[in-house]
Amino acid sequence: MPAIALREALAGKAEVITPDLPLHPKEALRYISNLIACEQPDALVGNSCGSFYAQMQVPHVELPALLGNPYFKMTEFLKPRIGAQQYKSPRKDGHQQFIIDEQLIAEFAELEAHQFDHYHPQLKDRVYGIFGQQDTLAHFEPLFREYYNKVFHFPGGHTPTAEEVRQYYAPIVEKNFLNRL
């Protein structure tokens, strides 16, 4: 629900596109790439797995990005969760269940191994990270800092509440992305 909260927080200031992404990572990256080509956004914002995808897109599209609690090692998250799962946010297609299996984990492993291959130093100050101080799932701030300089914190957990999105995420987007337009 962070995407919906961001759309609401920036209403009248920016159009926030909140797509349902495909489950399989290569399909999701193709979908995002096509969406960027069609919509021509001014910035990318993602949370968790969405941050994993956004940071892989940045070198190709040269957009600034805000990565919320980026989960750079999705395989670590997925392995103990093999089986049927539920999406946290309602999906437009109504399908709330998905399956985590070894094939899906292998697909993420392939991308993880190459996720920083296209990184270049010009991105150091164009990609922002925001990390929940109570996040018990993703602890990738040190890895983020190996590549990027802009780091922020908020007091919440891995999935920010709507209030945390309004109070912490939206101001970063407004100050750093909208004012540059």
Model-derived segments and their meaning:
Residues M1-C38, H158:
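Active-site catalytic motif of lipid deacylating hydrolases and related acyltransferases
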Residues P2-A3, R7, A54, F140-F144:
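Short, highly selective alpha-helical patches that border small-molecule cofactor pockets
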Residues K13, P41, E62, K124-R126:
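A general structural motif
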Residues A37-Q40, R180-L181:
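Glycine-rich phosphate-binding loop signature in dinucleotide/nucleotide-binding domains
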Residues A43-L44, A65:
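Conserved alpha/beta-hydrolase fold motif
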Residues V45-A54:
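Gly/Ala-rich beta-loop-alpha elbow adjacent to hydrolase catalytic centers
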Residues Q57-V61:
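Aromatic pocket-lining residues of Rossmann-like dinucleotide-binding sites
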Residues P64-L181:
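The alpha/beta-hydrolase serine catalytic core
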